Amino acid sequence: MAKVLVLYYSAYGHIEAMANAVAEGAREAGATVDIKRVPELVPPDVAKASHYKLDQAAPVATIGDLADYDAIVVGTGTRFGRMASQMANFLDQAGGLWAKGALHGKVGGAFTSTATQHGGQETTLFSIITNLLHFGMVVVGLNYGFAGQMKLDEVTGGAPYGATTITGGDGSRQPSANELAGARYQGKTIAETAIKLHG
């Protein structure tokens, strides 16, 4: 049975919700799924004063965990059109795994959130995907088999490169039903690909 890791960073809970949806989709495909988050780099007093969501249930990942999975789906909010520094810092520690080729052939995917429709969703996904390709991973996006990609009757995230959500400038908008459906679809597709490749 394929093992899938949903690895995320979420300051305010939007990506945490998307990570749970990705995991639901992967489980639906028959994979064993773990959800883990990367360490917070913001000092605790600053995080609390900034109203970060500090009660997230997922355990904190270690870089060595990555080698234990057949698929790794990476999610993080955007910071100026690229992945958040917390995720970048974590992935930057994978040099030893990269040098050994420990991630070659694993399935990868990316998901993100931005404050606005044009807040850097695709560039943030690319910043994650670039890392996955350097690791030698097989990248799976959010294909157009997901009909929600074509919705024009509502503001919604989603790109062929990965599932996305729009949070609003003040963070008050939570992932919509369509955005969560996209995350589930991508999780299922990634797990199905991992099962085909790794059994």
From Swiss-Prot:
InterPro entries: Flavodoxin/NO_synth, Flavoprotein-like_sf, Flavoprotein_WrbA-like, FMN_Rdtase-like_dom, NQO. It is an enzyme of class 1 (oxidoreductase). Substrate binds at W98. NAD(+) binds at Y12. Pfam families: FMN_red. PROSITE patterns: FLAVODOXIN_LIKE. Its EC number is 1.6.5.2. Residues 4-190 form the Flavodoxin-like domain. The keyword Plastid does not apply. GO terms for cellular component: membrane. It catalyses: a quinone + NADH + H(+) = a quinol + NAD(+); a quinone + NADPH + H(+) = a quinol + NADP(+). One of its GO terms (molecular function) is flavin adenine dinucleotide binding. Keywords: Flavoprotein, FMN, NAD, NADP, Nucleotide-binding, Oxidoreductase. The keyword NADP applies. SUPFAM superfamilies: Flavoproteins (SSF52218). Belongs to the WrbA family. HAMAP family: NQOR (MF_01017). This is NAD(P)H dehydrogenase (quinone).
